[in-house]
């Protein structure tokens, strides 16, 4: 089968890691272009060495490339603000957009949860690195018992966060919180991100708290099994994704004022706590940068599903 040509806009950490994944690992995708705005960026230099067509003139440079018409899918690894402009320029030209920023123009997609729901959408949003790591856990709980409130804390090495990630911190929390509800199935969601400055850099760690009304111990076992199955589903495309310790399900004390976190409904009886770590594949940055790995792996997973669907309908 012929591979689908893709372009990546954004030659920073995420874009460069994604390019290496496509070149090394993909049976369905082929690099058509690497696009940046800094001629001196390491990502563009690497792309040139790997014989990938490059431009340092942004989206207009991409449109001007001789092979532009051959490119079917465009990954955007810039910033939320830039993606709005890039999408406005490329969507009328028939390019499928996979948004790796928190812009969220298109529907949220987390491969382990809703990979096949939006394969025909012209633009899909990959939420955030923290969302890709934690929303599957919220969904794993909510498919067993309603989740009144879910809170996630994503801790990533400061060294792995480039200028685009830092510019998107506010959008990160807003987009992830919304996707916890829209994809994870919680009634209400909250997201917190920590850029950990520790040296040497620490591996990505994520904590997920879900408040549930589940007094039955048999349901607790169902929740644990659902979480373990979901971890397996995610690790199928992010091999470094794993539980850091056993799932904890604890009774909420009567004097704990959890009502302030709820939309409405019954008071939750238990808190489900999930502790994760994500080790990167070290395709670009070292293994501590699991936040890159989970984002780029998820994006590539969706692009490959789109390519497979296209092949199946020929």
Swiss-Prot record:
Residues that bind NAD(+): 11-14, 160-168, 291
Protein name per its UniProtKB record: Acetaldehyde dehydrogenase 2
Source species of the chain: Rhodococcus erythropolis (strain PR4 / NBRC 100887)
Entry keyword annotation includes Amino-acid biosynthesis: no
Highest rank taxon of the organism: Bacteria
GO molecular function: acetaldehyde dehydrogenase (acetylating) activity; NAD binding
EC number: 1.2.1.10
Residues annotated as the enzyme's active site: 129 (acyl-thioester intermediate)
CDD domains found in the cross-reference section: ALDH_C (cd23933)
């Amino acid at each position: 089968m012929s591979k689908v040509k893709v372009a990546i806009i954004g030659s920073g950490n995420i874009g460069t890691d994604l390019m290496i994944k496509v070149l090394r690992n993909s049976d369905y995708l082929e690099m058509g272009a690497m696009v940046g705005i800094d001629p001196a960026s390491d990502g563009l230099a690497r792309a040139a060495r790997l014989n990938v067509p490059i431009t340092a003139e942004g989206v207009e440079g991409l449109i001007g490339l001789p092979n532009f018409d051959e490119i079917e899918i465009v990954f955007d690894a810039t910033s939320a603000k830039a993606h709005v402009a890039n999408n406005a320029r490329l969507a009328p030209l028939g390019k499928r957009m996979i948004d790796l920023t928190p812009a969220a123009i298109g529907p949220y997609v987390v491969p382990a949860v809703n990979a096949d729901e939006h394969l025909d959408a012209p633009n899909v949003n990959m939420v955030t690195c923290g969302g890709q790591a934690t929303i599957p856990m919220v969904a794993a709980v909510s498919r067993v018992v309603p989740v009144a409130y879910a809170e996630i804390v994503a801790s990533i090495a400061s060294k792995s966060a480039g200028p685009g990630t830092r510019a998107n911190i506010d959008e990160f929390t807003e987009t992830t919180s919304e996707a916890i509800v829209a994809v994870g199935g919680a009634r209400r969601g909250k997201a917190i991100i920590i850029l950990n400055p520790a040296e040497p850099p620490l591996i990505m760690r994520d904590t997920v708290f879900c408040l549930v009304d589940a007094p039955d111990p048999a349901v607790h076992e169902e929740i644990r099994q659902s979480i373990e199955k979901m971890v397996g589903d995610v690790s199928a495309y992010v091999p470094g994704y794993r539980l850091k310790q056993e799932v904890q399900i604890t009774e909420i004390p009567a004097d704990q004022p959890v009502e302030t976190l709820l939309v409405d409904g019954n008071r939750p009886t238990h808190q489900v706590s999930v502790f994760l770590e994500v080790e990167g594949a070290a395709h670009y940055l070292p293994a501590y940068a699991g936040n890159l790995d989970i984002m780029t792996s998820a994006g590539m997973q969706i692009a490959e599903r789109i390519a497979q669907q296209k092949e199946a309908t020929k």
